[in-house]
Design a protein with these regions (language model features):
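Hydrolase catalytic cores
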Residues: 1-43
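Intrinsically disordered or highly flexible coil/loop and linker segments, enriched in small
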Residues: 42-46, 120
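Secreted peptidase-domain scaffold signal
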Residues: 51-140
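Noncatalytic modules at the cell exterior or secretory-pathway interfaces
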Residues: 107-109, 175-199
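Surface-exposed beta-strand/loop patches in noncatalytic accessory domains
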Residues: 122-178
Length: 199
């Protein structure tokens, strides 16, 4: 239960904070913790998939040392910034050559977004006034962007321009959520450009 889990998670957060030189934000600490989370093998059975989000959330966090040191087959980048209204942060990079075979990009992608949105209690159920989302994918030859990730637990992302009902945007895109996780395992490869973006 939460009375047992909460102190363990708080201890891990405190250990991460202590192990990092200098000061980092609360959002960065939470992002590091959540980014490390994994789903135990017990819960990977097919019968759990439809309820996994409500039963285990983003999963169980690793210990502080594993969170900060990672492993030799992965890299984690942390972007910590204050995003002003109607602005965005964009980062371009080339897909690692060691993960390109026969013109296709391979690898596992995981993105964790943690924000502290403005809250206005005058709006009651709609008190959260900002929605921040992530797009990650290929930069096409015409300079357009092709998104290649979807929110965790979703098989097909819904665009903000699809004119969906508010509840659908909340369910499918995790709209208004201050914590969002996106993930994709590229086992069969993605053809096309090897220049990618994070936005």
């Amino acid at each position: 239960g939460t009375s047992f889990a909460a102190p363990l998670v708080a201890k891990t957060l405190a250990t991460i904070d202590n192990m990092i030189d200098g000061n980092v934000s609360r959002e960065t600490l939470l992002a590091l913790l959540i980014h490390s989370c994994y789903v135990p093998s017990t819960f990977k059975a097919k019968e759990y998939q439809s309820i996994l989000k409500d039963v285990i959330g983003y999963g169980l966090p690793k210990d502080a040392s594993q969170i900060l040191n990672g492993d030799s087959h992965s890299i984690s980048l942390v972007f910590a910034n204050r995003i002003m209204p109607k602005k965005h942060l964009e980062f371009h990079f080339s897909w690692p050559k060691c993960l390109i075979r026969n013109g296709k990009c391979y690898g596992n992608i995981k993105i964790t977004l943690v924000s502290t949105p403005q809250i206005n209690w005058n709006y009651k159920d709609e008190m959260i006034r900002e929605n921040i989302s992530v797009s990650f994918g290929q930069i096409m030859p015409d300079n357009s962007h092709k998104n290649q990730v979807t929110p965790l637990y979703k098989t097909q992302v819904k665009k903000e321009t699809d004119h969906l009902y508010e509840w659908q945007l909340i369910e499918e895109n995790m709209k208004w959520s201050p914590i969002k996780v996106y993930e994709r395992n590229i086992h069969t490869g993605i053809s096309g450009p090897t220049n990618w973006y994070l936005d």
